[in-house]
């Protein structure tokens, strides 16, 4: 068996998956907290919130300076993973994040001290694909984790290992089947 866990490049490697796995540019920013203890892990959790401006997420200040914030589907920019400029953060990118910080986290509405560009790989329904390729059942695909697959790595690993070793899977994986598209 062959296992593809090629992230944003899966649609390029397996063209039949191009419309099922869409790489999207994502931007995160770290805003100066002025050393406020309010944004440290003991007082401030990892969070996500749905507000009229979108679905934001963030992290407390931990191991590097700044309160981290991002917006799911940042500017809705689908990208070619080979052509993404990971070094370019625009004024518009910063403004999208700053608007949220100023509205909901005013104590961190300071200088953006660091920014980072990455990719999320989304499926049309935003659920993962973990399945065999129907035309080539010896090939397994695990992709479309949209920046949060790491939270599920133990169970995804178990599913992929079961598929690869042709062992019985004790979990219902219908929601991850590629046939849903």
Describe each PLM feature range.
Residues 99-181:
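C-terminal catalytic lobe of FAD-dependent flavoproteins
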Residues 4, 8-135:
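Active-site substrate-recognition segment that forms the wall
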């Amino acid at each position: 068996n062959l296992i593809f866990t090629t992230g944003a490049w899966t649609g390029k490697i397996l063209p039949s998956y191009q419309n099922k796995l869409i790489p999207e540019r994502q931007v995160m920013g770290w805003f100066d907290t002025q050393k406020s203890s309010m944004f440290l892990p003991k007082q401030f959790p990892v969070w996500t919130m749905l507000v009229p401006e979108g679905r934001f997420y963030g992290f407390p200040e931990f191991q590097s300076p700044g309160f981290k914030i991002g917006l799911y589907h940042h500017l809705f920019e689908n990208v070619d993973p080979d052509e993404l400029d990971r070094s370019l953060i625009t004024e518009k990118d910063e403004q999208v994040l700053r608007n949220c910080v100023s509205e909901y986290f005013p104590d961190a509405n300071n200088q953006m001290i660091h920014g980072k560009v990455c990719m999320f790989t989304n499926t049309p329904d935003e659920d993962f694909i973990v399945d065999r390729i129907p035309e080539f059942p010896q090939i397994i695909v695990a992709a479309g984790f949209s920046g949060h697959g790491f939270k599920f790595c133990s169970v995804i690993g178990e599913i992929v290992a079961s598929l690869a070793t042709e062992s019985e899977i004790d979990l219902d994986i219908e929601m991850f089947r590629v046939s849903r598209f």
